[in-house]
Amino acid sequence: MNHILQAILLGIIEGLTEFLPISSTAHLLIAEDMLGFHAPGEVFPVVIQLGAILAVVAVYWRKFWDVLVTLPSSQDSRHFVLTVLIAFLPSVVAGLLLHGFIKKVLFSPEVAPLVIATSLLLGGILILVLERVRPAVPRFSDGDRLPYAKAFQIGLCQVLAIFPGVSRSGATILGGEMLGVSRPAAALFTFYLAVPTMLGATVLDIYKNRDALVGAAWTDIGIGFVTAFLVALVVVKGFIGFLSRYGLAPFGWYRIAAGLALFAWIALA
């Protein structure tokens, strides 16, 4: 398979999985290994991730624009910005302190497959269990107006996503539900929180890999970026409706199946 087709396929995988609770990082790492896709190195997944992030901005641009223009005069806008920043803070601290450990240990070829398989399997089981014990009547149903304490607690849940295979969206949506936030509101807040979180992670990774930017295969990167953006647009637009109807259980079963399949693959390799 040539690089263009590989870039398209990886862009599709990134766009599909970035905002679903199944871990885009796990799927990209596994797909890259199976496809033998190594060029242009670590720069490719970092940049195409930005395409998926921009899909959120494209879908919710009116919300972000209204907040921006009314920020000086609107208490609601200031509250919204503060909740997102408060939830973002734990990931900033964890990312800056643990970036080297995350990349060198958790993402090492020797450790990553086992971490991913374990995270997928345990995460799937946890989803199925917690979906049964979550509060029957949510206390908070507005993703734009969460209390600061709840936003911070959701941000702490997001830190778990430093482990490949955990899923940032899965951790925040499930954590939000357990904190009394309705499923649609938790998913909406997850989308909002994704913008600074993933943008910050992307900027940090690009800076750390700045030497690799020279001579990178920008055609492959551009194709993956655009593909991830377009696919993520569809996912972002339909995800909350799907979640409201079916819940997280389908993703829990998928994660269990994927984790078991990966364990089998590791054993046979």
Please report, for each region that a protein language model flagged, where it lies by residue.
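Multi-pass membrane proteins that catalyze or facilitate reactions on polyprenyl-/lipid-phosphate substrates
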Residues: 1-269
